[in-house]
């Protein structure tokens, strides 16, 4: 099974991707995480990618496509995966279809711009286990202590400020809305209301994928 999660930054793709992937025992491939890992390396490619991220711009298709192809053709993904954040435009979608022939399901997370900004500005994660929190909606049960692993060290993303977020959302709309129209005609396109809470969204996705 190959599942693509589409939606703007802050729509909840990462949170749901991890949950659903664990439930159906498939890898969750988060494109943003892949590129953030690359950025931490001391390479010219990392510096180039980081410049796009800091400015809230999308990384060029030729860079994204090659990185993703190298990942997806690995043997560990031969049985399927949940793909979070790719493709983002028609050119990427057609490139993806050129080397992936399996049937896919596309799930789009529909969320208002105002809620997206709050979700992104408020989010942070445990540095130890990666558990995601939000200062507006989902704080740890005990202040400054991770619910999962008990760590008190958290990571706040440096590219998450309101001006950059608004630009990322606008860039997303320009690049990705034509892709949504393209997939609507595929017969395997589904929309979930991303404004619901985590549990409700998870249930909706499980129904689409026909899992318990």
Curated annotation (Swiss-Prot):
Region NMP: which residues? 30-59
Gene3D superfamilies linked: P-loop containing nucleotide triphosphate hydrolases
- Name assigned to this protein: Adenylate kinase
* Keyword annotations of the record: ATP-binding, Cytoplasm, Kinase, Metal-binding, Nucleotide biosynthesis, Nucleotide-binding, Transferase, Zinc
**Catalytic activity reported:** AMP + ATP = 2 ADP
Which subcellular locations apply to this protein?
Answer: Cytoplasm
User: Which pathway is this protein assigned to?
Assistant: Purine metabolism; AMP biosynthesis via salvage pathway; AMP from ADP: step 1/1
Upper taxonomic lineage = Bacteria, Pseudomonadati, Pseudomonadota, Alphaproteobacteria, Rickettsiales
Domain comment?
Consists of three domains, a large central CORE domain and two small peripheral domains, NMPbind and LID, which undergo movements during catalysis. The LID domain closes over the site of phosphoryl transfer upon ATP binding. Assembling and dissambling the active center during each catalytic cycle provides an effective means to prevent ATP hydrolysis. Some bacteria have evolved a zinc-coordinating structure that stabilizes the LID domain.
Q: Where is this region: LID?
A: 122-160
Predominant location: cytoplasm
- Membrane-spanning segments: none
PANTHER family in alphabetical order: NUCLEOTIDE KINASE (PTHR23359)
Q: What does the record give as the function of this protein? A: Catalyzes the reversible transfer of the terminal phosphate group between ATP and AMP. Plays an important role in cellular energy homeostasis and in adenine nucleotide metabolism.
EC number(s) per entry? 2.7.4.3
Q: Does the keyword Transit peptide apply?
A: no
Q: Where does ATP bind?
A: 10-15, 123, 132-133, 196
Could you tell me the superkingdom of the organism this chain comes from?
Bacteria
Subunit structure as annotated in this protein's UniProt entry: Monomer.
A Gene Ontology annotation in the biological process aspect, one of them, is: AMP salvage
The first-level EC class reads transferase
Q: In which residues is AMP bound?
A: 36, 57-59, 85-88, 92, 157, 168
